[in-house]
From Swiss-Prot:
It comes from Lemna gibba (Swollen duckweed). The keyword Ligase does not apply. Induction: Accumulates to high levels when grown under continuous white light. This protein is coded by one member of a small multigene family. GO terms for cellular component: chloroplast. It holds the Pfam family RuBisCO_small. The gene is RBCS1. Its main location: plastid. It is found in: Plastid, Chloroplast. RuBisCO catalyzes two reactions: the carboxylation of D-ribulose 1,5-bisphosphate, the primary event in carbon dioxide fixation, as well as the oxidative fragmentation of the pentose substrate. Both reactions occur simultaneously and in competition at the same active site. Although the small subunit is not catalytic it is essential for maximal activity. Keywords: Calvin cycle, Carbon dioxide fixation, Chloroplast, Photorespiration, Photosynthesis, Plastid, Transit peptide. Gene3D superfamilies: Ribulose bisphosphate carboxylase, small subunit. This is Ribulose bisphosphate carboxylase small subunit, chloroplastic 1.
Length: 173
């Protein structure tokens, strides 16, 4: 077999002076064996007057709901953006409503179906929905039918069989 000199690549030997060889960790001789005890607390760092105390959330009257509840009420445009996010992730939008926006126990001391963990579904899940305006229209319809109820939108992943997002779309006044 005949090999052309133009086709043969030239091999250069590796240069050893480019990177130093790994010699392991530094020896413990470089580190002090004993430490001097520092009992002088005046040398501790201090933030001085820069500290401002945070208040706790009031336990009465200002309850928090679900995702995004720390924000002001969402506008229709904000709701549409959230629903678009839900649809981009291939989640099925569902609309639910409830008189109470919180978990409560009314019928029994032990948890059960009617203790507020499950909300009533508004119609059927919106399988095949591709437009946020369809979901917003259903929310508006639920608000008209039940103006004194909370309305929320959930995103259900039908492949994993889990609820992936849930947020309040309407709070009664």
């Amino acid at each position: 077999m005949m090999v052309s000199t133009a086709a043969v690549a030239r091999v250069r030997p590796a240069q050893t002076n480019m990177v130093g060889a790994f010699n392991g960790c530094r020896s413990s001789v470089a580190f002090p064996a004993t430490r001097k005890a520092n009992n002088d607390l005046s040398t501790l760092p201090s933030s001085g007057g820069r500290v401002s105390c945070m208040q706790v959330w009031p336990p009465e009257g200002l309850k928090k709901f679900e995702t995004l509840s720390y924000l002001p009420p969402l506008s229709v445009e904000d709701l549409a953006k959230e629903v678009d996010y839900l649809l981009r992730n291939d989640w099925v939008p569902c609309i639910e409503f409830s008189k109470e926006g919180f978990v409560y126990r009314e019928n029994n001391a032990s948890p059960g179906y009617y203790d507020g963990r499950y909300w009533t579904m508004w119609k059927l899940p919106m399988f095949g929905c591709t437009d946020a305006s369809q979901v917003i229209a259903e929310v508006e319809e639920a608000k008209k039918a039940y103006p004194e109820y909370f309305v929320r939108i959930i995103g259900f992943d039908n492949k994993r069989q889990v609820q992936c997002i849930s947020f309040i779309a309407y709070k009664p006044t």
